[in-house]
C-alpha cells in the first residue's frame, strides 16, 4: 500500500511522500515558550491553535496517521537569484525590489489543495473513511510531521530541509484513518556547525538555532503584519518587498541540491515590475485584485504592498 501511495503521489507532482504517526508533539514546551516570548507578534491564530498543534491526534476525529507530502516551488528563474538588491533593472539601472520565490506564481494553498484533494480521494478508494487534506491552513505542525515521516530535518533556519533537494518545498498533509505504517522519523541533524542562516539574516530574526522571532522576520513584516514596518527594521529589508529568501538562499543544502520545480503553477509570471518603486502606488484596487487575486500577494492587500514596496525601495537607497 505504501509504495502504491508513493507512486500515486509522485504522479501528482509531489517530490516526496511519507507517513507520520499522530502522537503528541515533542515541541509543545518550546511552542509555549515561543508564544510567551512574544515571538509570534500579531499572529493571534497561533495562540488559538496551540493546543491542537501540540496534540495532532485531536485535529481530525478518527484519524490515525498523517500522509505528509512535499511540493517543490523553486521557479526556474529563482535558481540563479542571489541576495536581495543585487540585480539591476535593465531599463532604469535601479537595483530591483525582491519578491520571495514561492510568491511568483499561483497561490500555493490553491495549487496544493487541488493535488491533496486527489490524493484524499485515492485514499478513500482504498478503504479510508477519513481523509482530510490540509495545505498550510490549519493547526497542523507540518514540519514536525514531515520530520516524523522521514522526509527531512528541521534546520537552524526553522525550515524543513530535505537531503535530496534542500528547503524550497511546501508541506501538505492528509489526515486519514487508513492503516498505514509510519515511515520512521529523520532524527539526524545535518546542519552541523554551519550558522550561515543566522549570520545572513539582516534583521537578526533567527535569535538562536531553530528559534525565529517573527516580529523581526522580513517575511512576517511584509506579509502577516498589518502594522507599519518599524523604522529600526525598515532600513534592513535589503530590497525585499514581499517575503524573504535569504536564510534559504545561503543554505549549503540549497546551493548544492536545489533544482527548479517542474510544476507550471509555481513559475514566475512576471506580474510584478520589480524595477518600478511606484508600481503598486499607481495601481487601483480593482486592478490589484484582477492581477494578484490568485497569488500570495493578495494576503497583505494593495495597502500592504504599497507599504512594502515603499519601504523596500528606501532600503535600497545609498546611505
PLM features per residue range, with description:
Residues 290-291, 298-316:
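Long, compositionally biased charged/polar accessory segments in the mid-to-C-terminal portions
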Residues 14, 196-219, 237-265:
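Iron-sulfur cluster-binding cysteine motifs and their immediate structural context
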Residues 221, 225-242, 273-298:
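Short Fe-S-cluster ligation motifs
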Residues 177-182, 216-225:
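A short, charged helix-loop
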Residues 1-190, 229, 238-239:
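Auxiliary alpha/beta "docking" domains used to position bulky ligands
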Residues 251, 255, 259-286:
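Conserved Radical SAM active-site core
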Amino acid at each position: 500500500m505504501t509504495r502504491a501511495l508513493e507512486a500515486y503521489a509522485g504522479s501528482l507532482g509531489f517530490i516526496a511522500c511519507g507517513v507520520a504517526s499522530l502522537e503528541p508533539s515533542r515541541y509543545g514546551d518550546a511552542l509555549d515558550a515561543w508564544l510567551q516570548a512574544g515571538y509570534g507578534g500579531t499572529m493571534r491564530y497561533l495562540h488559538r491553535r496551540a493546543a491542537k498543534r501540540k496534540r495532532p491526534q485531536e485535529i481530525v476525529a478518527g484519524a490515525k496517521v498523517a500522509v505528509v507530502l512535499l511540493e517543490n516551488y523553486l521557479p526556474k528563474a529563482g535558481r540563479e537569484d542571489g541576495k536581495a538588491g543585487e540585480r539591476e533593472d535593465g531599463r532604469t539601472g535601479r537595483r530591483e525590489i525582491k519578491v520571495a520565490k514561492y510568491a511568483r506564481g499561483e497561490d500555493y494553498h490553491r495549487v496544493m489543495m487541488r493535488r491533496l484533494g486527489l490524493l484524499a480521494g485515492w485514499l478513500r478508494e482504498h478503504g479510508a473513511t477519513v481523509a482530510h487534506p490540509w495545505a498550510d491552513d490549519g493547526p497542523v505542525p507540518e514540519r514536525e510531521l514531515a520530520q516524523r515521516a522521514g522526509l527531512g530535518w528541521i534546520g537552524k533556519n526553522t525550515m524543513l530541509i530535505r537531503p535530496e533537494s534542500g528547503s524550497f518545498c511546501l508541506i501538505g498533509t492528509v489526515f486519514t484513518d487508513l492503516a498505514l505504517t509510519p515511515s520512521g522519523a529523520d532524527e539526524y541533524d545535518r546542519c552541523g556547525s554551519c550558522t550561515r542562516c543566522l549570520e545572513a539574516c539582516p534583521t537578526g530574526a533567527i535569535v538562536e538555532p531553530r528559534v525565529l522571532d517573527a516580529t523581526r522576520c522580513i517575511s512576517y513584516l511584509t506579509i502577516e503584519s498589518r502594522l507599519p514596518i518599524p523604522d529600526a527594521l525598515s532600513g534592513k529589508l535589503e530590497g525585499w518587498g514581499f517575503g524573504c529568501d535569504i536564510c534559504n538562499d545561503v543554505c549549503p543544502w540549497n546551493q548544492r541540491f536545489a533544482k527548479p520545480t517542474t510544476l507550471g503553477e509555481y513559475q514566475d509570471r512576471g506580474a510584478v515590475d520589480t524595477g518600478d518603486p511606484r508600481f503598486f502606488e499607481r495601481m487601483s484596487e480593482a486592478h490589484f485584485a484582477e492581477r494578484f487575486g490568485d497569488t500570495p500577494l493578495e494576503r497583505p492587500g494593495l495597502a500592504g504592498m504599497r507599504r512594502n514596496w515603499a519601504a523596500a525601495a528606501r532600503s535600497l537607497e545609498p546611505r
